[in-house]
Amino acid sequence: MAKAKYERTKPHLNIGTIGHIDHGKTTLTAAITKTLSQVGGAKATSYEEIDKAPEERERGITINTSHVEYQTETRHYAHVDCPGHADYIKNMITGAAQMDGSILVVSAADGPMPQTREHILLSRQVGVPYIVVFMNKIDMVDDPELLELVEMEVRELLSFYEFPGDDIPVLMGSALKALECGCGTRECEWCKHIWELMDAVDSYIPLPQRAVDKPFLMPIEDVFTITGRGTVTTGRVERGQVKVGDEVEIVGMREATRKTVCTGVEMFRKLLDYAEAGDNIGTLLRGVDRKEVERGMVLAKPGSIKPLTAFNAEVYVLTKEEGGRHTPFFGGYRPQFYFRTTDVTGIIQLPEGVEMVMPGDNVQMAIELITPIAIEEGLRFAIREGGRTVGAGVVTSLNE
């Protein structure tokens, strides 16, 4: 069969395997690449290659992650797999590997285990929107009733964490058997399960909304005055687009927001009619004094984001080896929170029953900032102390 070339026309999604240690995440990842390689949709990647995940650094945190890519008839996927449990936690909290959906791998022989639960909870907290389940190792289970029982348990667990447990596709198979066979046909006793899984991923996980289609937001990095023209703010457009003549809202660093009109957009010293997600631009703002705008604020579509001081977050605390703290911290701890372009002091409140947080822990916490910031669910931040990063977090809910 002729080798399929990489068609850029296919929509792209980011997915990953999650689940308890030794339930077969990496074997499944290898089996997917092996199966799809038979039809030119992937380069077969061995278990060993995926398992020796290279170290990456995201916001100063060391994470081991493996990336493979493959395509089905309709889509192109980038797939992440992590060797260690801690790597998943760091990945999900820092957003190093943003997932549009994930494949939860559960061993049919063992059923849901502590990390199964933790990965589902983290997916809920950090906003992984869709989960497809692969019940693995069915070659080790003789009793069909046991399979039903495990499926029921998994569905209940998903529902408990507010995923649609009754509607989520649950596929069954043996990643190892499919990998060992490797014929990749839909008729094969073992390889067909990999195809069933990919069909479910294709149909159940929807295409993500593109950044450019979301409401406009640009973190302000710098502000200056152009004599005779007015105040210019510069920054990189995070999402959406802005056209000359659009009304925008200045949000953050103050209780009140301020609406103004964008009267000019320029990039690389050229004037534009509009700018969109990913562009580094300068925006001219009508009637705004230079003293009214500062780094740390954002320009946004009016009404799309509010300045807030109180929110809940899921946080990973760096280990001493990662350059973090050497000692635990307690409730009432007052570090700096770095959002987008600026540091703001905040006070940490730990959940009931949690006395202290050790380096290397991940924890849910409530945070009260001393200055309002434009905050929304899913926003990532770093926790800093004396200029060094000691934690990474993601906003899970707002306390207005």
Curated annotation (Swiss-Prot):
Enzyme Commission numbers on file: 3.6.5.3
CC annotations in GO: cytosol
G5: annotated segments: 174-176
One family name in Pfam for this protein: GTP_EFTU_D3
Superkingdom per UniProt: Bacteria
Predominant location category: cytoplasm
Main enzyme class: hydrolase
Protein name: Elongation factor Tu 2
Region listing for G1, in residue ranges: 19-26
Organism: Syntrophomonas wolfei subsp. wolfei (strain DSM 2245B / Goettingen)
Protein's cellular compartments: Cytoplasm
Family per similarity comment: Belongs to the TRAFAC class translation factor GTPase superfamily. Classic translation factor GTPase family. EF-Tu/EF-1A subfamily.
Keyword terms of this UniProt record: Cytoplasm, Elongation factor, GTP-binding, Hydrolase, Magnesium, Metal-binding, Nucleotide-binding, Protein biosynthesis
Stretches for region G2: 60-64
HAMAP family: EF_Tu_B (MF_00118_B)
Assembly information from the UniProt record: Monomer.
Domain tr-type G positions: 10-209
GO molecular function list: GTP binding; GTPase activity; translation elongation factor activity
Summary of the function given for this chain in its UniProt record: GTP hydrolase that promotes the GTP-dependent binding of aminoacyl-tRNA to the A-site of ribosomes during protein biosynthesis.
Residues engaged in binding Mg(2+): 26
Residue ranges, annotated region (G3): 81-84
Region (G4): 136-139
Catalyzed reactions: GTP + H2O = GDP + phosphate + H(+)
